[in-house]
A protein has these predicted regions:
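Extracytoplasmic gate region of multi-pass secondary transporters
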Residues: 26, 203-243
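Helix-to-loop junctions at the C-terminal end of transmembrane segments
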Residues: 57-70, 252-265, 348
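C-terminal ends and interior cores of transmembrane alpha-helices
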Residues: 79-92, 275-287
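Helix-loop-helix hairpin linking two adjacent transmembrane segments in secondary transporters
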Residues: 94, 125-182
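Paired small-residue
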Residues: 95-104, 290-298
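Cytoplasmic helix-loop-helix junction between adjacent transmembrane helices
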Residues: 100-138
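C-terminal transmembrane helical hairpin of 12-TM major facilitator-type secondary transporters
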Residues: 266-310
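A late C-terminal transmembrane helix in Major Facilitator Superfamily
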Residues: 317-352
Length: 388
């Protein structure tokens, strides 16, 4: 089968698992709050349950070293995500949504970890390694699609139940279409089975930085719709910010995927992406539409592009260990994400808003960029010493 078909199917799988299964919670939060199912603090805890599940799923995916294990997690996670989204239509109240979001987090992590490694193998075997990065447009296209669906449903006066049902049916149709087209884990293609040796020293600062990114990006990514709804009460303009976030994120991934490769370019782009994202988080604090618009552009653009850059940087640092490193990086990212909604819940409880949490999120992104900049300089020095 054509590698292009495999990559497109993988992109749509991430559309389902991440864009629908994971991030559809964001446009639903204003509904859940307006319907009296939860308050802002409860919404933060529901999001935290989702990210705790993501952490559990990522850690579990580290154990999927055999093709049969990876196969079960990929397809089990994909179909579980569909079922969970449909089941959310009948859920009401805090605890049912906590349980479902936790399960959705586990399922989405399984799909992301396994499929990221498989897509990289497909692209490398086809002699077109840059193709693998395009699968990261899947989550952002899912965000765009669910955001537009949410806008249409809100204009029609529908609540959270109808939205969950539409998201679930969309995921079901796509999963039926792509199931036979997805790459299958195979014994000889499983990079995790090849001897990789110890991880290079440069990998660990990348892991720490990516964990900080999890803290930094997740608060605006989770609460953007709620922040817009709070500023534009009853206006349809509030529903435009989330699909716009998805569109900008898609453009960011395409820009990174199509950039001209060069020595050290991945590190430079990563530092720039993280610092732009920090500005975007701070911009969410500006009053009115201007602040949210800047937040959409500068948080959305680097949103998935930074994830792609981290994965590319990890492959550059440790090519043979890439499959195992994807799982560890995703676990670190998930741990950071878990801290984000908890910070948001504490911020809401003690200050009545998200301002303190957003300031801490921006600080985490600035620190992550600084760590990557320092690591780049150290790698340059080591390279000069080795040549000398």
């Amino acid at each position: 089968m054509s590698p292009i078909i495999r990559i497109v199917a993988s992109t749509l799988a991430l559309f389902v698992a991440m864009g629908v299964g994971r991030f559809s919670l964001t446009p639903q939060l204003p509904h859940l709050i307006a319907e009296g199912q939860v308050d802002l603090t409860g919404a933060g805890l529901i999001a935290a349950a989702n990210y705790l599940g993501y952490l559990v799923g990522a850690l579990d995916a580290l154990r999927a070293t055999a093709p049969a294990q990876a196969h079960r997690r990929l397809f089990g996670g994909l179909w579980a995500g569909v079922a969970i989204t449909l089941a959310s239509s009948w859920a009401f109240g805090f605890w049912p949504h906590v349980a479902l979001r936790f399960a959705a987090g586990v399922a989405s992590a399984w799909v992301l970890v396994v499929l990221t490694a498989l897509a990289a193998q497909v692209a490398v075997q086809a002699g077109r390694p840059r193709l693998a990065g395009l699968i990261f447009t899947g989550p952002s296209l899912g965000v765009l699609a669910t955001g537009l669906m949410a806008l249409a449903l809100n204009l029609l006066g529908q609540g959270s139940s109808g939205a969950w049902l539409l998201y679930g049916v969309t995921a079901l149709v796509l999963t039926l279409a792509i199931h036979p087209l997805l790459p299958r884990p195979q014994e000889r293609a499983d990079v995790a089975l090849q001897p990789a040796g110890p991880r290079p020293r440069a990998f660990y600062p990348l892991l720490v930085a990516y964990s900080l990114v999890g803290i930094g990006y997740i608060i605006p990514a989770t609460f953007l719709s709620q922040m817009a709804a709070a500023q534009f009460r009853g206006q349809w303009l509030a529903d435009l910010f989330w699909p716009a976030f998805g569109l900008i994120a898609t453009l960011g991934v395409l820009l990174v995927s199509l950039r001209r490769p060069g020595t050290g370019s991945t590190g430079r782009w990563l530092v720039g992406a993280l610092w732009l994202q920090a500005f975007g988080v701070l911009a969410c604090l500006f009053p009115g539409m201007t602040g949210l618009a800047l937040g959409v552009i500068f948080c959305g653009g680097p949103f998935l592009a930074s994830m792609l850059l981290v994965m590319q940087r990890a492959r550059e640092i440790d090519p043979l260990g890439h499959a195992r490193n994807v799982g560890l990086l995703t676990a670190g990212f998930a741990l950071g994400q878990l801290g984000g909604p908890l910070l948001a819940a504490l911020s809401s409880h003690f200050s009545g808003g998200l301002r303190p949490a957003l300031l801490l999120a921006a600080g985490a992104l600035l620190l992550a960029g600084g760590l990557m900049l320092k690591t780049r300089e150290e790698v340059k020095v080591e390279a000069v010493v080795c040549r000398g």
